[in-house]
Amino acid sequence: MYHRLILLALIGTTMANVIPFSMSTIPEEYKEFIPEEVRNFYKDLTVEDKEILRELASKHATFANEDAALEALKAKSDNLYKNAVELRNFVKAKIDSLKPDAKTFVDEIIAKARSLRSDDGHKLDTEKIKQAARDIIAKYQALSEETKEELKVTFPAIAKIIGNEKLKRNASTFLQKN
């Protein structure tokens, strides 16, 4: 159970960097687990900013890479681009500070999260999300204790999630096969 929670936290953190979403869709009791920098980014979005993010998210398959997506964002809004780059740099700095095993693990989570996005902008496939989480859990369990501890220290929101009994129950229910 402990491992599932850590992984869901990491997935959540990386998904925030990968898939634009609205903070208003997150239940209040879970918002405290979103890193402050991510909350601030979404809190400061204007209606126009949200529309730009939705538009670009629906076209994500047309971008060769993250830099191409950021260039498209810059063409739409310099201010939104600046804020997105600031958030990206924050997350990138955390990832870059990790030792090789932890960094590789987080990079794999990001790649897995990106692979879950629908090319046509439709809803994410819940079964694919569950399978991705199971795959990541298996990889996490194979990590050394030192690497697991480094992940907890680098991503402190995880520590809050680990101790939350309601989230533990929800994670267990969500990851059941059917």
UniProtKB/Swiss-Prot annotation:
Taking the first listed entry, what is the main subcellular location of this protein, grouped into a coarse class?
Answer: secreted
GO cellular component assignments = extracellular region
Q: How is it modified after translation?
A: Not glycosylated.
Question: Where, if anywhere, are coiled coils annotated?
Answer: 67-89, 130-153
UniProt superkingdom: Eukaryota
For the keyword Calcium, the answer is no
Its family? Belongs to the fatty-acid and retinol-binding protein (FARBP) family.
User: What is the designated name of this protein?
Assistant: Fatty-acid and retinol-binding protein 1
The organism is Wuchereria bancrofti
